[in-house]
Design a protein with these regions (language model features):
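Short, solvent-exposed mixed-charge patches
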Residues: 193, 287-288
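Cap/insert and terminal regions of metallo-dependent hydrolase folds
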Residues: 161, 167-170, 178-280
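Binuclear metal-dependent hydrolase catalytic cores
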Residues: 1-172, 178, 261-287
Length: 288
């Protein structure tokens, strides 16, 4: 389920978050702002959440982390909540737990320890290291294997994508990255590739307009972000070479919320011959 499909720019969509349900597990990959509220609005079982996997530590991928730790517990989560991520994850989760300490105690004081089991209030960090241009299996349980792999989001390091495997089925989540050879290798013959995308032609027009308007700061930001994301033609070519069965695009910059932008995307994605989905918040994809 593509819970959140947006970038940091304001809009109706939630920031990045993808839910994966597999063999009794409920995982979330990234938890940007708005993901918690969107998860509940979609009717997803937040109290059953047992794993969060972070791709990197930009705000639009992790800003709802304290919120989801707290909200899932307050609403009735009785299982442990495990957080997985590359280098620096432990300090991040410890900070979130510390931030919530007073709030958690207020809940116990009001509702009692029988209702609010304080032992489940804290999230449990699982930090791992992925070397450059390499991958590591960092989760194996109940027939599920999850592999983290290095992606290209420089100067943001670490940054990873994830390969989820179960009974011969494969789903790959790119995280934020420019075109990446290792990602292409990991995505080979996968059932679904969930990949970020940037409409570079639109960004260049936006950059030109900001320059003409004298918006130096915003112009610099729009210029800079183009060098660590993947363009439409690039992601289409990668998916075609990797023989991806279905391409689901998220972290859409800009959001394809009108027919003009949507058609610009589709016109530039013709290099992929398989099914393409410009994801909306709440879209569901089933791998059989």
């Amino acid at each position: 389920v593509t819970v959140g499909t947006a970038t940091p720019l304001p809009g109706e969509r939630a920031q990045t978050g993808t839910a994966v349900f597999v063999n009794g597990h409920f995982f979330l990959f990234d938890v940007g702002a708005g993901v918690v509220q969107k998860t509940e609005n979609l009717g997803l079982p937040l109290t059953r959440l047992n794993g969060i996997f972070l791709t990197h530590y930009h705000s639009d991928h992790m800003m709802d982390l304290p919120n989801i730790i707290s909200r899932s517990w307050v609403m009735g989560r009785t299982n442990d909540l495990h957080i997985y991520g590359p280098d620096s994850l432990t300090s991040l989760v410890n900070a979130a737990n510390a931030f919530l300490r007073i709030e958690n105690q207020h809940r116990v004081d009001h509702h009692g320890p029988k209702i609010m089991d304080i032992t489940k209030a804290k999230a449990i960090p699982h930090e791992y290291h992925v070397a450059q241009n390499s991958s590591t299996v960092m989760f194996q349980e109940d027939g599920i294997t999850i592999t983290a792999f290095d992606v290209s989001h420089e100067p943001i390091e670490p940054a990873v994508g994830y390969l989820i495997e179960y009974k011969g089925k494969k789903v790959v989540i790119s995280g934020d990255t420019k075109e990446n050879a290792l990602l292409e290798k990991m995505a080979r013959d996968c059932d679904i590739l969930v990949h970020e995308v940037m409409l570079m032609s639109f960004q260049r027009m936006l950059e030109k307009g900001l320059d003409e308007a004298g918006q130096e700061r915003n112009n610099k930001i729009i210029h800079d972000i183009q060098d660590y994301h993947t363009g439409t033609t690039e992601v289409a070519a990668l998916a075609e070479r990797a023989n991806v069965k279905k391409l689901v695009l998220n972290h859409l910059a800009p959001a394809p919320d009108n027919v003009v932008i949507k058609n610009m995307y589709l016109n530039e994605l013709k290099g992929f011959s398989g099914p393409i989905h410009l994801a909306n918040d709440g879209d569901t994809f089933i791998v059989k």
